[in-house]
């Protein structure tokens, strides 16, 4: 500390008890001290820049940076990253991850920079084995949520009024209901244009393996752009991708088969793999029968596909995934309702019945998915 600042601190701390804390002299001293300290800090940053002292890629503070968790960051940011991952906390930024001062203003943006700017990796952090050093509020929330803490966070940098929430917009997914619905509609349109061999017409396990391999690549691409995926960890993203593959291989194929099954019928012969044939017959007797009854159009199929994916996920995954799943279901259902109101002559009761019928179709999907998993294990398809 320089001599001028030291002397000023001594003068302020040595004020007599009789002096008023609001006196002009005291206030001027404090203002002068604040300006002096601010200039000292600015000068320090300038000197560090001139001397080419490296700055932390997360908080931009010139300091000693070292390898941590597969990346490079300062000790403070590395400790923040370790604590966030080990306690399984998921921060959600309310400002679309555009906070300027990531270190102090928003933990969600700070964690984002830990991953993207500093290259820190979740897999390098060990989970806490004992609750000895875990904060009480974390333990309490873990008991209620199954082990994962999801927190929305945005520290105020300036007193700004909260923006008015947009109608039909998900604050968590950061996307409107119409855009979310369009995402799934685009996936179905791609399947129609792809003109891949229909799964219900194949005969051999090799054909199924080829279709699954192609759909895995398409599902990976879809998951990269799927709203809310950036809020999930690596394992959760793998689960979502698995359900996308299932919906692409079996749900979309069954719907396409129902539209043109007279052109897709295969000849009766003995070249079928027996287990595959049994499962395809099961799909035809359940899902295909339902599609033939309800005659879903492409908009309804897109909504049904989304509902299937996230309803399957909802029952066996993390707290964060359940939150994202509910956001997807609410957004898609709202967009489908808006489609009926805008493009059909259905009244509110008819719309409610139709959406209920589409949602109830998911019941048959649970058993199909379970039997598909057994089939894949039997014939050696990675699952």
UniProtKB/Swiss-Prot annotation:
Q: Where are the zinc fingers (NR C4-type)?
A: 56-77, 93-109
Q: Where in the cell is it found?
A: Nucleus
* Transmembrane regions: none
PROSITE patterns listed in its UniProt record: NR_LBD, NUCLEAR_REC_DBD_1, NUCLEAR_REC_DBD_2
Q: Where is the NR LBD domain?
A: 172-383
Query: Which keywords does this chain's UniProt record carry?
Result: DNA-binding, Metal-binding, Nucleus, Receptor, Transcription, Transcription regulation, Zinc, Zinc-finger
What are this entry's molecular-function GO terms?
Answer: DNA-binding transcription factor activity; sequence-specific DNA binding; zinc ion binding
- Domain of life the protein comes from: Eukaryota
Q: Does the keyword Flavoprotein belong to this entry?
A: no
Work out whether the entry's keyword set contains Transport: no
User: Which Gene Ontology terms of cellular component type are present?
Assistant: nucleus
- Residues within the DNA-binding region(s): 53-127
Query: One of this protein's Pfam families, by short name?
Result: Hormone_recep
Instruction: Quote the PANTHER family the UniProt record gives.
Output: NR LBD DOMAIN-CONTAINING PROTEIN-RELATED, NUCLEAR HORMONE RECEPTOR FAMILY-RELATED
Similarity remark: Belongs to the nuclear hormone receptor family.
Known role: Orphan nuclear receptor.
Q: What is this protein called?
A: Nuclear hormone receptor family member nhr-217
Which organism is this protein's natural source? Caenorhabditis elegans
List the taxonomic lineage. Eukaryota, Metazoa, Ecdysozoa, Nematoda, Chromadorea
């Amino acid at each position: 500390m320089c001599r001028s600042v030291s002397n000023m601190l001594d003068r302020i701390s040595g004020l007599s008890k009789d002096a008023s804390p609001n006196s002009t002299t005291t206030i001027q001293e404090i203002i002068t001290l604040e300006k002096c300290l601010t200039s000292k800090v600015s000068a320090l940053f300038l000197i560090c820049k001139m001397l080419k002292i490296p700055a932390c890629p997360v908080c931009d503070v010139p300091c000693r940076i070292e390898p941590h968790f597969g990346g490079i960051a300062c000790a403070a940011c590395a400790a923040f990253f370790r604590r966030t991952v080990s306690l399984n906390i998921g921060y959600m930024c309310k400002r679309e991850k555009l906070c300027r001062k990531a270190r102090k203003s928003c933990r969600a943006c700070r964690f984002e920079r830990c991953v993207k700017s500093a290259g820190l990796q979740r897999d390098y952090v060990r989970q806490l084995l004992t609750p000895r050093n875990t904060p009480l509020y974390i333990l309490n929330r873990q008991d209620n949520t199954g082990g994962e803490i999801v927190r929305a966070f945005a520290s105020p940098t300036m007193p700004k009024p909260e923006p008015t929430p947009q109608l039909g917009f998900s604050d968590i997914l950061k996307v409107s209901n119409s855009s979310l619905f369009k995402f799934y509609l685009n996936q179905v349109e791609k399947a129609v244009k792809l003109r891949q061999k229909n799964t219900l017409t194949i005969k051999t396990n090799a054909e199924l393996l080829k279709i699954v391999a192609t759909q895995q690549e398409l599902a990976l691409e879809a998951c990269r752009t799927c709203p809310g995926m950036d809020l999930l960890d690596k394992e959760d993203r793998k689960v979502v991708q698995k359900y996308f593959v299932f919906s692409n291989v079996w749900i979309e194929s069954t719907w396409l088969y129902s539209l043109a099954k007279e052109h897709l019928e295969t000849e009766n012969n003995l070249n079928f793999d027996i287990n595959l044939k049994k499962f395809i017959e099961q799909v035809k007797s359940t899902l295909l029968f339902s599609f033939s009854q309800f005659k879903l159009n492409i908009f309804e199929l897109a909504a049904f596909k989304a509902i299937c994916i996230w309803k399957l996920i909802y029952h066996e995954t993390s707290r964060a995934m359940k939150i994202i799943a509910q956001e997807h279901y609410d957004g898609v259902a709202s967009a489908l309702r808006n489609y009926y109101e805008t493009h059909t002559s259905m009244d509110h009761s008819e719309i409610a019945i139709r959406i209920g019928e589409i949602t109830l179709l998911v019941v048959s999907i649970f058993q199909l998915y379970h039997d598909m998993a057994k089939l894949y294990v039997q014939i050696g398809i990675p699952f």
